[in-house]
Amino acid sequence: MGAPVYGSSWPAHIPFPTSHPLWIGNLPTRANEIAQNLKAYDAIFALGGKSLITILYTEGSAVPSGIEVFQLSADARDLGRTYPTKLSVVGDIRASLTVLLSLLAPKIASRAEAYTALRKHAARDQEARRARLMAAADAEFTGPVTTPLVAGREMARAIGPNIAIVDEAPATLGHLRAFLNTSSTHQYSFSRGGALGWGMPAAVGFSLGIDRAPVVSIVGDGAALYSPQALWTAAHEKLPVTFVVVNNREYNILKKYMASQPRSASVRANRFIAMDIVDPAIDFLALAASMGVPARRVERAADIAPAIEAGIASGVPNLIEIPISAT
């Protein structure tokens, strides 16, 4: 078809190769921003039931008027649940797509030239998007404090295309996803439920579930406070999990949401109660050491990738703290 492919706005994983030229990226989590991404299209083919999850409220629908929605899901309860559809079909997604592809193949073959042109155009667009991201990260690379954009790029660069990632770091997850470049559909996992504390124990479970293979757990400092005992389990089981704590010393996503509400008492008083994780700051190196996990702090952006590469290569549980800016 040559159609662009978007991921769910709040994914449990990324079930499409991020290296594919038709991959655009995950949708945002606000309805108005999703609509902005989709407004150029005539139709959407939604696979599964939770493609357009919105987290923070904005006016209007995530699906712009005039766009036809076709939906395929294995669960009938998903169909038409959050937006009207022109056609909804119940069926196993893999089996259904296999049949659809066989039906599409002769149609694509008869339009081979147009299809090839679409693929080439998509590849050029993807290359341009990645180049813009790289340039933006380069511009911030030598700043006094590592920015979320730079941290996301350097983490993705160090991890590469084959190591499993368990992500629970809201400050950097969008940037990390933008730099992923893998043919795998199983590399990246995320907590769809949204509750804090999932990431570190999930990474331990992932490693156990894939024959004790290396896993990188990326976690925000706030989320890390909910289940740090996962460090002890990783040490006890001698699992090759590299825990990367991106530390902005605040519940950043909550603070930003509060700041976006101009009528809130917090904004009027410029006081965000219980949002700052300071006084005292958490000593993650001491916390890791208390549970038998070696740890290091990386202050310079240039040292992030080498530190993560060394952590993965060590074959033992380890923790890397990366102080980052709030924006």
Predicted features, each with a name:
Residues F45-A46, Q71, D167, S217, ...:
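Redox-cofactor binding/interface segments in oxidoreductases and associated redox assembly factors
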Residues T29, A35-A40, G80-T82, S88-V90, ...:
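Thiamine diphosphate
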Residues P4-S9, F70-S73, F243-V246:
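Short internal beta-strands
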